[in-house]
Amino acid sequence: MAVRGPTSIVVMPLALHRLLEAPELAGHRDMWSAAPRALAARHGLVHTRAGGADCVAAAGLPGLRVLNHALGAIADPAAVERFFVKQGVPARVGVPEGSAAERAVAARGYERDLAWMKFARDPRAPVPEPETAGLAVRPVAAGDAHRMGELVAASFGLPDDLGGWFAPLATRRGWHCLGAYDGGRLVATGSLFAAAGGGWASLAATDPAHRGRGAQGALLAARILVARRLGLRHVVVETGEPVGGRPGTSWRNILRAGFLPVFLRPFWRSTPA
């Protein structure tokens, strides 16, 4: 399996790939299982295992990639495709670059879509101390859970009511939700889900009025320290591959926090019949 390092391409054993995917997949499952029933019914939120993969769909929001995709060890692409056909949304599968699964979906006529780059780092390594413009980083208070949900929903382009999906994660077991505060107001957030000896950094969101103040750099550093305190062996995070060869702000923040790119995960999309 090809791995894109800072200066070279090496081969990653499948076992290592699965090790680095495990915290994200566990967090993904837990987050979807936490969706309130009323919201799940309203938007057609469904998650299941099919064909060896973790499959999620939002029938009411078919155009949102973040809510309609399959991840994990895809062993039976046909079974994965049947899941999406049943939900009435296009199939989007995230597969390791250069893998047998990627070749299988390409053979089914799928088209390559956007890709996510996976990054990893050892939480025991030195952690940068990013500067923030007057922001304080601390755990999200229970009273700010609703605000956290609002920020996450807005950041991912989701309907406002789906903030009620993410808000309970602030106090849910396994989740460590941190916030950047301007005085007493929560203006940015980021979470760490701990599982399988690793941590998945996710749900990064910043109020647009407070961008450029170093919030996400500080939140990444704080989550690395949480992972260290928990005794985790690695922290992983992902972001979209550069468009036009120009890394975005998220990519640059991740590198500054000491993460290294470890593998690319392309998404492949089914084509209309």
Regions found by a protein language model. Give the residues of each.
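N-terminal charged segments
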Residues: 2-86
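A short helix-loop-beta-strand connector motif used in the catalytic cores of GNAT acetyltransferases and
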Residues: 40-49, 88-90, 113-115, 169-179, ...
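A conserved beta-strand-loop-helix scaffold within acyl/acetyltransferase catalytic domains
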Residues: 159-208
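Helix-loop element at the rim of GNAT/NAT acetyltransferase active sites that forms part
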Residues: 87-88, 151-161
